[in-house]
């Protein structure tokens, strides 16, 4: 029975399209297997697993049981693996959810041969098909599908759509990733989701019910064994167990009975169903046969239809050909126009021929002209004869002229000789004049050099001032122009806008014209090509004509030459005779006639040749035309060839696109099936319409906004420019008031930050622009692709038709071009491929037609449901029409937008240029503000003016600018006037000095005469009575002589100093020249840098302006986006409202659902009741049925009996026969009954077996449920772990990113540090090189110092010899002095001295006034530091002390020192590069002022030296003494040396004598000086070594300032420097000696001094004892201070002092201090007080004091001065000491003779090595001092024995050792 039912199902299933598709993967059964074998192979799952492997080869290989042998469990296992793999593939790779119920593996495994089984297998195959179609190898599988029959293909396509597009079966998860989905797309998705949810809930409920039932059954089964076990247990009572078991058995019996009843009913129903099915089957078979016949008919119809289709295609091709032929006809018609053009061209050529004929006529005319010329030749011959006569006359005149020229040449030679003689004489005279001038210039040289220098300085200063004035005027003019331009810009912008509008209209017109002109251009180009060819041909013809004409010209020239020859021969013959002439003429005439004939024949030949050439020309033209035609054809062919190639490429592209189209077609088919999606798309269209309308409106609004923005921007740019100017002014003023110098750094940082921010904005803007451009491009690409696809779909057929026509053309062209044949063959192949593809497309179209028909049926059904939607579709169609119109409008708007954008670009460029101008204005304004600050604008007023309006501010600024400019000009004019006044004063002063020198020389000569006279008097015998008088007179005369000598010495010193100054100025000139050259080079480099920086600045400014403009555009875009966002927010709010309403509906539905559940429960209860009633009714029905059957049987029996009785009545025989028949029937019925009984037994057995299998299945389900629960728990755990791991992974990812960021930061820092390290290393190397050079210089200076000391010793010996000679002379002169003493008047030199001092006071007073004015102007300018001053003081010379005048060795050392130090100064020049230009200007000012300061200092020195002689007369003249003290103090104050010793000249020389001469004892020195030492107890040896005079620190300016302040302090405290007022005084300072860096070490100096003289040792011991004593008494609680602390304190002091003072202020302060000190000295005449000061951290002398670690030394305060008082008796000198004084004076005279040597008065090394860079240089000095290993000498008090040399030497050695050990320890610490 089952086989009979299943076989037709199986046959249907195996012929189904899904199975046929699966068979494409391979044979199902080996060999010729039956359908059953193939079905079994399918159901077993092995084959299907293999198919899945082919689809997804990446699958994990799971064990598949290949030998199933009809085992249900193995089958289920295989199929479950398959189902799992399919589910995994859909979810993971395809991102799809299987919504349809998965194929039931149980049914397939246990009941494969049933309808349910086949349906489940169908599901499996469907899912497999979905996998195959969407996998990576889908192309192969689709090709296999295409290889199938048409019907199967169509069915498979339908199945594919079921799987892929029907969301009820498979749900796509990719929409989850899409963020921007419209509402219309979301709505159908939500509906589907709701349906799916409902279905899932229903399934869940069903499954839960089944689970409950199964669990109850399981509990029932478990209950029996449990009961039996409880029965066995002895605990329970037996009575209870029996009752329970009985109840349980009764329940089970009832259940069993109910089941039996159900089974019986089912059996009966099934039998009835079977009968019904048989009947239906028969009907179905009939219908099948009918359908098969119909199918056959349809197939025959389809074949005929295909035939008709082929014919249709042929007709279509013919139609296409007709179209193409028509197009060709149109082309030929177009060519007709070309023919007309060619006709016109022929006419033109004819005209050209006419022109050529005209040229021919012209040539003939020319020939006639030549004939006329030949006639004229005779006339010309006559004229020639006349000209020859004239020539003869001219030659005569020429000869006369030659003679005259020769005469003139002779005269010229004589004059030249005379000139040479006069030149020689003049040269000789010039040479003599030069010699004379040289002699005169030797005396006037210094004056000229000074005058020149001052003139140059003034002229350079004037030039610079003029340049500055010009630049300022230019800036003012520029500002005014910019203001005017800014005012005019507004009107310009309005005009520009109008012009822009007008231009935009013009542009539109021009664009149309351009299109027309392009077309005309193309025509012109074609014409030009033709014309070019014709031109080339014509040029060839013209060349040939030229050649012919040249030949003719040559022939004519030859004829002319021949004629000329004949003319010449005629002339010759004219000399002979007339008869011969006539004959010759006749002959020549004949020759001429012949030549004319020849020429005429030649001309005729030429004409003939011309005609031939013309013919040839015409022939060639015809050929040219043909060639042109051929070329045109070639061009056409080439174009066609190119077109064909393009078409081929297009076809290839289309082939590629066809595949994409197929996919799109499949998608379109799916869309066709679903009308909802079409409606959604219509909704989208409406949405797009609305969006486009909005966009159009937005574009219009944006255009309007842009125009408004442009206008507002223009206004804003004006306002912004003004506001920016004001803001920048305000900010600069505030920051300058707050910070000053720090503003520059801050502004630099700000600019850098702004640049960075601008760069960031740049990058962001670029990125945004790129994104916008990309999005626009993508949109355009998508639109173009859509249009292309539509166009390609339309043009595919046209292309095919064109290809066919082109193929025919190619066949025609094959003969001419072999290359084209290959291309045609390729095209034919392509054509075949295309035809195949066409066929395939047709088939697909047929499939589509079938699908469309199905869709139409569905659409018909849907249309009934959705009539309202159809109305909406109509509305949407109208909107589509609107859309098209809007698109057109949009295109127009886009065009307008492009024009607007162009205008915007131009406006942006204008904006950029305007912004650049404003920025330039800002820069100029900033410069002006800086200059205003320098000039001294009152900033408080400006701050008050901030509150006023913009106009008033602007006016105020203009007025202030003008006033400040005027002020600056006035100040500059005053400065120039002051400089000129100084010049005049200096020149007058020089003249006065020279006059004084002359008078001194005269006095000196007079004195010499007097001495000679005295000698004469001494030779006569002296009178004994007048001895005392003579002695007194001699004393007076000696005094006067000494005064005169001192005066002479001073004059000579002045002379020497002037010479030294001259040399120093020369060296300074050279240095300045070199510096100037270097500075010029630096300026050029800086100018280049500034130019490059300006260019960069301009580029940056342009970029900045562009960015600002772009930023404004982006802002406008952002505003539009914000508007859109607002609209979206409104939409969102509406959606939220809708959502709320939906939620409410949902809640209502929930409540309904709850009520329904309750109703359902009630119904279930009713159902149970009805079930029980139904069972009872069934039982009743059964009994009634059995009774009915019995009654029927009885009824039949009765009928039979009745019939029998009737028949018995009729025919007894018939009854007998009937009985026999009945007996046979009874037998058959018995047999049937037996068979029925047997069948009943079988059914019982089957029932038992089924019950058994059912119980087994229940057990298996229980096991599976437990497994399922376990798996569920495992799954939950794994999910939890997965979430945890994902969280950890995200954390780790974040950490990794942070680490990445930190690593990049660290890398950047490392790179920066490495760069810094490299820079520091380079700087260190540079510093090391500088240190090395300085060390080398130091060594050279030490060597020079040693040499100078040796020279000093030699000179000392010479001076001693001279002293002895002078003593002898003095003894001789004493006698003469006695005689002439009465007539000697000593007052004039004093008066001269006073006159000089008065002049000095006037000069200083005038300078004070000038300096005060300068202070006012300079204090307002902010000084960076005094480094520039320090640098400019390089050539500044130290004034020499009075104590070191005669020592030549010192000056020798100094000259060498100046050379080296000048080199150092030049090396240190590069640090000037980094300074601004204003500082350079300031430097120039300082340099000029310094040169004048040097002059003043030299004058001051002269005054000091005059003071030494005139103070011998202490009680006589007080005023002169005061003045000289002032000048002496000034000499000390101008020096940069802090420790400068103030010994008298005589005292110093006496010391030198004592030190160097061994014969003199300690008694030779004045005892008064010793007593002074003992009384004060504070005398120190203060003589300098050779190089100590040059000991100066790096910060000379600060020292000068400090010294000035301290001089003031000293004056207030009634303390002054001790001067050498008397010959017997030794005023020694308390300070130590200062050891300079260029000089020898103090230890070497001490050693030398101690070795040379024991007296000096004695003095040292005494001074040290006195000092030690004083320190102990004075400061018992003093501290030891480190050098670094001391330096830091000093730097703090000096930095404060430097800011308030300039170089010119020094003189004012010096003069004030001098005036105070002079007053004080005038009051305290008898007692001379010495002030010894030590400035903190200024000199190495101070370091000498402070480095010692002994506690006895004082810690000097940073602002206090160390003052020690030296009191000396001012009494008259004793007779014992007078001799010594005389000796000293004589020695000074002898030494003075050697002051004229060149080394004597050179500037010191320290004067040149006055370094620059105040604050920065201090630190470098500090570093140098800390690195210096040399320690100062800590001098201990020596033992009592003063004469011992050994103790001093040992002390010095110990100090040397201690210093070495300390230096080593320091080096170790530093390392």
Swiss-Prot record:
Residues 196-425, 458-1385 form a coiled coil. Residues 1417-1430, 1445-1459, 1559-1578, 1787-1799, 1807-1818 have a biased composition (Polar residues). InterPro entries: CH_dom, CH_dom_sf, HOOK_N. Disulfide bonds: none annotated. Keywords: Cell membrane, Cell projection, Cilium biogenesis/degradation, Coiled coil, Cytoplasm, Cytoplasmic vesicle, Cytoskeleton, Epilepsy, Guanine-nucleotide releasing factor, Intellectual disability, Membrane, Neurodegeneration, Neurogenesis, Phosphoprotein. Residues 1838-1851 have a biased composition (Low complexity). Residues 1713-1823 are annotated as: SH2-like. It is found in: Cell membrane; Cytoplasm, Cytosol; Cytoplasmic vesicle; Cell projection, Lamellipodium. PROSITE patterns: CH. Expressed ubiquitously. Changing residue 1684 to A: No effect on guanine nucleotide exchange factor activity. One of its GO terms (cellular component) is endoplasmic reticulum. Homodimer. Interacts (via GBA motif) with guanine nucleotide-binding protein G(i) alpha subunits GNAI1, GNAI2 and GNAI3. Also interacts (via GNA motif) with guanine nucleotide-binding protein G(s) alpha subunit GNAS. Interaction with G(i) alpha subunits occurs before interaction with GNAS and is regulated by phosphorylation; phosphorylation at Ser-1675 enhances binding to G(i) alpha subunits while phosphorylation at Ser-1690 abolishes G(i) alpha subunit binding, promoting binding to GNAS. It is linked to PEHO-like syndrome: An autosomal recessive syndrome characterized by microcephaly and moderately severe hypotonia manifesting at birth, seizures that progress into infantile spasms with hypsarrhythmia, brain atrophy with bilateral polymicrogyria and pachygyria, thin corpus callosum, and mild reduction in cerebellar vermis volume. Patients also display optic atrophy, severe cognitive delay, puffiness of the maxillary region of the face, and edema of the dorsum of the hands and feet. This is Girdin. It comes from Homo sapiens.
């Amino acid at each position: 029975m089952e086989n009979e039912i299943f076989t037709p199902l199986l046959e249907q299933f195996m012929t189904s399209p899904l199975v046929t598709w699966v068979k494409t993967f391979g044979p199902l059964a080996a060999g010729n297997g039956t359908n059953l074998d193939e079905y079994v192979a399918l159901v077993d799952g092995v084959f299907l697993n293999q198919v899945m492997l082919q689809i997804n080869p990446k699958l994990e290989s799971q064990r598949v049981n290949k030998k199933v042998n009809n085992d249900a469990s193995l089958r289920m296992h295989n199929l479950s693996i398959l189902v799992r793999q399919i589910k995994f593939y859909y979810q993971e790779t395809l991102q799809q959810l299987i919504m349809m119920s998965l194929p039931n593996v149980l049914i397939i495994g246990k009941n494969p041969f049933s309808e349910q089984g086949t349906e489940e297998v169908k599901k499996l195959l469907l899912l497999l098909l979905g996998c195959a179609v969407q996998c990576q190898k889908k192309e192969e599988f689709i090709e296999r599908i295409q290889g199938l029959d048409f019907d199967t293909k169509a069915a498979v396509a339908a199945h594919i759509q079921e799987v892929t597009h029907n969301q009820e079966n498979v749900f796509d998860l990719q929409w989850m990733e899409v963020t921007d989905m419209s509402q219309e797309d979301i709505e159908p998705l939500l509906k589907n989701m709701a349906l799916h949810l409902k279905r899932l809930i229903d399934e869940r409920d069903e499954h839960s019910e089944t689970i409950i039932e199964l669990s109850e059954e399981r509990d029932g089964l478990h209950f029996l064994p449990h009961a039996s076990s409880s029965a066995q247990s002895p605990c329970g009572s037996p009575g209870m167990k029996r009752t329970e078991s009985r109840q349980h058995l009764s329940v089970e019996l009832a259940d069993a009975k109910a089941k039996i009843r159900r089974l019986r009913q089912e059996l009966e129903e099934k039998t009835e169903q079977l009968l019904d099915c048989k009947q239906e089957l028969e009907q179905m078979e009939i219908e099948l046969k009918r359908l098969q016949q119909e199918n056959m008919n349809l197939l025959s119809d389809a074949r005929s239809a295909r035939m008709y289709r082929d014919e249709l295609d042929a007709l279509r091709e013919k139609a296409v050909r007709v179209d193409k032929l028509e197009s060709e006809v149109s082309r030929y018609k177009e060519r007709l126009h070309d023919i007309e053009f060619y006709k016109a061209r022929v006419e033109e050529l004819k005209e050209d021929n006419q022109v050529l004929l005209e040229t021919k006529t012209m040539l003939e005319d020319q020939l006639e002209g030549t004939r006329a010329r030949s006639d004229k030749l005779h006339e010309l011959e006559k004229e020639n004869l006349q000209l020859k006569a004239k020539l003869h006359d001219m030659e005569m005149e020429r000869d006369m002229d030659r003679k005259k020229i020769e005469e003139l040449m002779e005269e010229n030679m004589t004059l030249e000789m005379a000139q040479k003689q006069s030149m020689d004489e003049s040269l000789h005279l010039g040479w003599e004049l030069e010699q004379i001038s040289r002699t005169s210039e030797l005396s006037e040289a210094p004056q000229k050099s000074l005058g020149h220098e001052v003139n140059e300085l003034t002229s350079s200063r004037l030039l610079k001032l003029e340049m500055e004035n010009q630049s300022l005027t230019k800036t003012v003019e520029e500002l005014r122009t910019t203001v005017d331009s800014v005012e005019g810009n507004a009107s310009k912008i309005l005009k520009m806008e109008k012009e822009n509008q007008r231009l935009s209209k013009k542009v539109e017109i021009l664009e149309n014209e351009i299109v027309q002109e392009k077309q005309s251009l193309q025509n012109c180009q074609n014409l030009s090509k033709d014309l070019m060819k014709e031109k080339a041909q014509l040029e060839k013809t013209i060349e040939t004509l030229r050649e012919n004409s040249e030949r003719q010209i040559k022939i004519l020239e030859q004829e002319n030459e021949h004629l000329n020859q004949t003319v010449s021969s005629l002339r010759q013959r004219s000399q002979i005779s007339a008869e011969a002439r006539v004959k010759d003429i006749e002959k020549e005439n004949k020759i001429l006639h012949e030549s004319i004939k020849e020429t005429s024949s030649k001309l005729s030949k030429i004409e003939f040749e011309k005609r031939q050439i013309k013919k040839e020309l015409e022939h060639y033209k015809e050929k040219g035309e043909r060639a042109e035609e051929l070329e045109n054809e070639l061009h056409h062919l080439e174009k066609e060839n190119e077109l064909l190639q393009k078409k081929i490429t297009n076809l290839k592209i289309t082939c590629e696109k066809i595949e994409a189209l197929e996919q799109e077609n499949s998608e379109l088919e799916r869309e066709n099936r679903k009308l909802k999606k079409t409606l959604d798309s219509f909704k989208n269209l409406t949405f797009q319409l609305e969006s486009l309308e909005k966009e159009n409106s937005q574009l219009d609004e944006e255009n309007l906004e842009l125009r408004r923005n442009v206008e507002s921007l223009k206004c804003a740019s004006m306002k912004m420019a003004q506001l920016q100017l004001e803001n920048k002014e305000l900010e600069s003023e505030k920051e300058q008031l707050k910070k000053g110098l720090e503003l520059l750094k801050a502004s630099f940082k700000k600019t850098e930050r702004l640049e960075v921010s601008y760069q960031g904005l740049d990058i962001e803007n670029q990125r945004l622009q790129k994104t916008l451009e990309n999005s626009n491009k993508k949109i355009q690409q998508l639109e173009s692709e859509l249009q292309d696809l539509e166009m390609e779909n339309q043009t595919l057929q046209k292309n095919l038709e064109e290809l066919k026509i082109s193929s025919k053309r190619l066949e025609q062209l094959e003969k001419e071009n072999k290359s084209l044949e290959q291309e045609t063959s390729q095209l034919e192949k392509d054509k075949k491929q295309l035809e195949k593809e066409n066929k395939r497309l047709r088939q697909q179209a047929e499939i589509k037609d079938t699908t469309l028909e199905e869709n139409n049926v569905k659409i018909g059904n849907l249309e009934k449901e959705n009539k309202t939607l159809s109305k909406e579709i109509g509305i949407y169609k109208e909107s589509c029409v609107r859309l098209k119109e809007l698109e057109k409008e949009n295109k127009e708007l886009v065009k307008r937008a492009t024009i607007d954008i162009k205008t915007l670009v131009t406006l942006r460029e204008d904006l950029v240029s305007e912004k650049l101008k404003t920025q330039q204005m800002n820069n100029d304004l900033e410069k002006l503000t800086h200059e205003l600050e320098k000039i001294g604008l009152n900033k408080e007023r400006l701050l008050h003016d901030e509150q006023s309006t913009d106009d008033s501010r602007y006016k105020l600024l203009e007025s202030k600018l003008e006033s400040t400019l005027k002020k600056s000009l006035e100040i500059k004019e005053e400065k120039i006037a002051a400089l000129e006044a100084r010049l005049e004063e200096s020149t007058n002063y020089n003249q006065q000095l020279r006059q004084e020198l002359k008078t001194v020389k005269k006095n000196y000569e007079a004195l010499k005469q007097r001495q000679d006279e005295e000698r004469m008097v001494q030779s006569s015998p002296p009178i004994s009575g007048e001895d005392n008088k003579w002695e007194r007179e001699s004393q007076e005369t000696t005094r006067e002589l000494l005064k005169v000598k001192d005066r002479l010495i001073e004059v000579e010193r002045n002379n020497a100093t002037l010479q030294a100054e001259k040399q120093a100025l020369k060296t300074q000139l050279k240095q300045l020249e070199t510096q100037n050259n270097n500075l010029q080079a630096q300026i050029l480099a800086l100018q280049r840098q500034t130019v490059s920086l300006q260019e960069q600045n301009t580029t940056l400014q342009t970029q900045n302006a562009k960015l600002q403009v772009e930023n404004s555009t982006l802002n406008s875009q952002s505003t539009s986006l914000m508007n859109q966002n607002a609209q979206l927010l409104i939409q969102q709010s509406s959606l939220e409202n809708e959502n709320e309403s939906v939620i409410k509906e949902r809640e209502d539905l929930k409540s309904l659902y709850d009520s329904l559940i309750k109703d359902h429960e009630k119904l279930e209860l009713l159902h149970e009741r009805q079930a029980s009633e139904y069972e009872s009714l069934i039982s009743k029905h059964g009994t009634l049925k059995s009774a009915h059957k019995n009654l029927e049987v009885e009824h039949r029996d009765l009928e039979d009996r009745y019939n029998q009785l009737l028949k018995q009545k009729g025919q007894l025989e018939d009854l007998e026969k009937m009985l026999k028949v009945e007996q046979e029937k009874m037998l058959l019925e018995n047999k049937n009954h037996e068979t029925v009984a047997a069948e009943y037994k079988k059914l019982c057995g089957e029932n038992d077996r089924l019950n058994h299998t059912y119980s087994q299945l229940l057990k298996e389900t229980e096991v599976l449920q437990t497994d399922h629960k376990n798996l569920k728990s495992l799954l939950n755990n794994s999910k939890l772990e997965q979430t945890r791991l994902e969280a950890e992974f995200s954390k780790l990812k974040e950490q990794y990113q942070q680490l990445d960021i930190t690593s990049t930061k660290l890398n950047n820092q490392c790179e920066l540090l490495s760069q810094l390290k490299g820079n520091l290393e380079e700087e260190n190397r540079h510093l090391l090189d500088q240190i090395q050079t300085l060390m080398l210089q130091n060594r050279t200076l030490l060597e020079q110092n040693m040499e100078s000391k040796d020279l000093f010793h030699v000179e000392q010996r010479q001076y001693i010899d001279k002293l002895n000679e002078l003593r002898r002379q003095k003894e001789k002169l004493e006698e003469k002095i006695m005689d002439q003493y009465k007539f000697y008047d000593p007052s004039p030199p004093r008066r001269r001295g006073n006159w000089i001092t008065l002049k000095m006071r006037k000069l200083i007073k005038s300078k004070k006034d000038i300096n005060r004015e300068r202070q006012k102007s300079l204090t307002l300018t902010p000084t960076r530091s005094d480094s520039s001053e320090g640098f400019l003081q390089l050539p500044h010379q130290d004034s020499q002390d009075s104590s070191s005048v005669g020592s030549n060795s010192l000056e020798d050392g100094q000259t060498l020192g100046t050379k080296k130090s000048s080199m150092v100064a030049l090396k240190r020049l590069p640090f000037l590069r980094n300074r601004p230009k204003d500082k350079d200007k300031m430097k120039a000012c300082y340099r000029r002022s310094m040169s004048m300061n040097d002059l003043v200092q030299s004058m001051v020195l002269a005054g000091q030296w005059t003071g030494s002689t005139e103070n011998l007369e202490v009680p006589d003249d007080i005023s002169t003494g005061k003045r000289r003290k002032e000048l002496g103090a000034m000499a000390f104050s101008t020096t940069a040396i802090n420790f400068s010793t103030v010994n008298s000249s005589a005292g110093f020389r006496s010391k030198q004598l004592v030190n160097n001469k061994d014969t003199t004892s300690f008694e030779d020195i004045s005892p008064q000086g010793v007593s002074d030492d003992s009384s004060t107890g504070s005398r120190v040896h203060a003589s300098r070594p050779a190089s100590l005079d040059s000991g100066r620190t790096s910060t000379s300016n600060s020292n000068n300032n400090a010294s000035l302040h301290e001089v003031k302090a000293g004056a207030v405290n009634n303390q002054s420097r001790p001067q050498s007022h008397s010959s017997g005084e030794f005023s020694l300072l308390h300070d130590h000696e200062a050891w300079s860096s260029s000089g020898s070490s103090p230890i070497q100096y001490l050693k030398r001094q101690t070795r040379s003289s024991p007296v000096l040792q004695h003095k040292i011991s005494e001074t040290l004892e006195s000092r030690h004593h004083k320190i102990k008494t004075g400061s018992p609680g003093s501290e030891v201070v480190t050098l670094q602390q001391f330096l830091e304190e000093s730097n703090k002091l000096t930095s404060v002092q430097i800011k308030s003072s300039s170089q010119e202020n020094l003189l004012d302060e010096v003069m004030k201090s001098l005036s105070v000190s002079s007053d004080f000295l005038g009051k305290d005449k008898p007692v001379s007080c010495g002030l010894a000061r030590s400035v903190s951290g200024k000199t190495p002398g101070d370091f000498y004091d402070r480095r010692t670690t002994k506690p006895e030394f004082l810690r000097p305060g940073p602002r206090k001065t160390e003052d020690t008082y030296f009191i000396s008796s001012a009494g008259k000198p004793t007779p014992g000491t007078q001799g010594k004084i005389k000796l000293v004076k004589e020695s000074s005279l002898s030494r003075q003779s050697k002051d004229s040597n060149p080394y004597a008065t050179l500037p010191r090394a320290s004067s040149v090595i006055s370094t620059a860079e105040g604050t920065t240089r201090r630190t470098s000095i500090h570093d140098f001092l800390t690195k210096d290993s040399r320690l100062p000498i800590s001098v201990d008090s020596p033992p009592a024995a003063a004469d011992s040399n050994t103790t001093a030497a040992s002390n010095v050695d110990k100090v040397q050792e201690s210093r070495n050990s300390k230096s080593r320890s320091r080096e170790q610490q530093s390392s």
